[in-house]
Regions:
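Conserved ATP/PPi-binding loop(s) of AMP-dependent carboxylate-activating enzymes
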Residues: 111, 128-132, 143-175, 211-213
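AMP-dependent adenylate-forming
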Residues: 204, 262, 297-312, 316, ...
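Active-site glycine-centered loops adjacent to acidic/histidine catalytic or metal-binding residues
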Residues: 71, 94, 127, 186, ...
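Conserved beta-loop-beta connector loops within the AMP-binding
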Residues: 132-156, 192-193, 255-261, 296
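Gly/Ser/Thr-rich phosphate-binding loop
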Residues: 11-14, 34-42, 48-121, 134, ...
Length: 324
């Protein structure tokens, strides 16, 4: 974490290695090799880029023990790739307002002997809340959801390390704080073991025909395809269903673009109901990113027309509740 790492590294007596404001995968690979980096952190797009670079170049990652991932969800395919090279990927979640850590996805002791796929499922989530943080998850009806890993709602948190208000921002304070609780803006689910999973940002969750679709879950599934370099999913306006998902995909250099779209759809059909499937897949050269490396869905919405993206799809093709 940009706030926490300098302090923890110093407290541990570790050397700091800073890659600069806009490092590319080659720079990161070089620093890991030459500086003997053991622990590093960054958003998933950084490590997806490193993965692709390593596939085409000989890179020595033997010094690297752990990657801490935050900012957005890491695809399980990414965690598996680094596991196969002896590098642990540790999910964490937090906010500046939380000073900054909220949860860490370490395995509970009763899961240490579980099978790899079970452990991977837990490690692919944002984890368990750190001590001192109280939380609840609220649905559209202001009711707390069940801890079943299926229902989801907005995550609210409170605790001694969480700010109680913003400085001189009365409108934001009224919107984001209620009775001592901070409304995080993250839509999450929580499983019976207490592991939270970020489903989406509240502003990015796709509302289609009265149902919610997780753009993050679709993105991670698409990026599990071997011929996909990057992918993001946004909701575009739809006359009948309110919104429908559209996927923006950056094909890997080796990809056959003529068959990739059907390959992606086949992958999604095996995992998700019909009404979750994207109404369109657009190939792009690069997903726009924010200054911190997160995907900028706002830029995509501004660049592309929903009418054009959904052209040719009849409304009933992806109707919620019309799954086979």
């Amino acid at each position: 974490n940009a706030w926490g790492m300098p302090f923890t590294a110093t407290a541990a007596g570790s050397k700091h290695v800073y890659p600069g404001p806009s490092p590319d995968p080659e720079d990161i690979a070089m620093l890991i090799e030459e500086e003997g980096v053991t622990v590093t952190a960054g958003v998933p797009t950084v490590w997806l880029g490193l993965m692709e670079y390593c596939e085409d170049n000989e890179v020595d990652l033997s010094s690297l023990d752990r990657i801490i991932v935050g900012g957005s969800a890491a695809p399980k395919s990414m965690i598996r790739w680094f596991d196969n090279r002896g590098v642990e990927v540790l999910h964490a979640w937090g906010m500046t307002e939380m000073s900054p850590i909220g949860s860490v996805s370490q395995l509970k002791s009763d899961l240490e002997d579980a099978g790899y796929e079970t452990q991977l499922d837990k490690r692919g989530k944002q984890g368990i809340m750190v001590p001192g943080i109280e939380y609840k998850i609220i649905d559209e009806n202001d009711e707390e959801i069940a801890w079943d890993g299926e229902e989801f709602g907005e995550l609210h948190v409170r605790g001694p390390t969480i700010t109680k208000e913003y400085f001189e921002r009365p409108e934001a304070n009224e919107e984001d704080f209620e009775d001592g609780w901070l409304k995080t803006g993250d839509v999450v689910s929580v499983d019976p073991d207490g592991y939270i999973q970020i489903v989406d940002r509240a502003k990015d969750v796709i509302k289609s025909g009265g149902e919610w679709i997780s753009s993050v879950e679709l993105e991670n599934a698409i990026m599990a395809h071997d011929d996909v370099s990057e992918a993001t999913v946004v909701g575009v306006p739809h006359e009948k269903w309110q919104e429908r998902p559209v996927a923006f995909v950056v094909p890997a250099e080796r990809a056959d673009r003529d068959t990739l779209e059907e390959g992606i759809m086949e992958l999604l059909r095996d995992e998700y109901p019909k009404w979750w499937l994207p109404d369109a897949i657009e190939y792009i050269e690069e997903v726009p990113k924010t200054a911190t490396g997160k995907f900028s869905k706002k830029d995509l919405r501004e660049q592309y027309s929903g009418d054009r993206l959904l052209a040719g799809n009849t409304p009933d093709e992806a109707a919620p509740g019309q799954d086979d």
